[in-house]
């Protein structure tokens, strides 16, 4: 199974669409089963950045795209927009043998992230459910 992981795309004023298009082309040539984007899809969490990012990410020819928010995605009103543009599940089965579990550490308008006690308890319970699978935590 091939999984591609991306992070820190930062669609915004400094974003290089031509460079990201080459990345998309490379990913498509690999034909992975899934793509995981681990935060900072946008730079300021603005609606036009989400729209552009969604349009570009939609060019990736893959069955499953799993996006996790980063601190930049939660800036301004981005925390209200993320789920609209990138709906996600916290438990993602990939094939018969792999599960990818996501944790969110972003907080609105804060640079630092946090995985708290309740999330750690949830993670422990969730991983036990999949004891017979390879587990990836992102």
Named regions from a protein language model:
Residues 47-134:
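Extended active-site neighborhood of metal-dependent phosphoesterases/phosphodiesterases
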Residues 2, 33-34, 64, 133-136:
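Residues at the starts of beta-strands that form the adenosine-phosphate
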Residues 1-10, 98-107, 136-138:
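Active-site-proximal beta-strand elements of phosphoester/diester hydrolases
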Residues 1-56:
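N-terminal active-site segment of His-dependent metallophosphoesterases
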């Amino acid at each position: 199974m091939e999984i591609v992981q991306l992070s820190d795309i930062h669609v915004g004023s400094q974003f290089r669409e031509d460079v990201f298009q080459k990345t998309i082309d490379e990913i498509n040539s690999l034909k992975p089963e899934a793509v995981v984007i681990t935060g900072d899809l946008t730079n300021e969490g603005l609606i036009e950045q989400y729209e552009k990012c969604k349009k570009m990410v939609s060019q990736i020819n893959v069955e499953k795209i799993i996006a996790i928010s980063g601190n930049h995605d939660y800036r301004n009103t981005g925390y209200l927009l993320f789920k609209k543009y990138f709906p996600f599940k916290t438990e993602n089965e990939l094939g018969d043998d792999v599960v990818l579990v996501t944790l969110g550490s972003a907080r609105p308008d804060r640079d630092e992230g946090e995985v708290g006690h309740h999330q750690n308890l949830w993670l422990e319970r969730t991983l036990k459910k999949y004891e017979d699978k390879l587990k990836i935590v992102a």
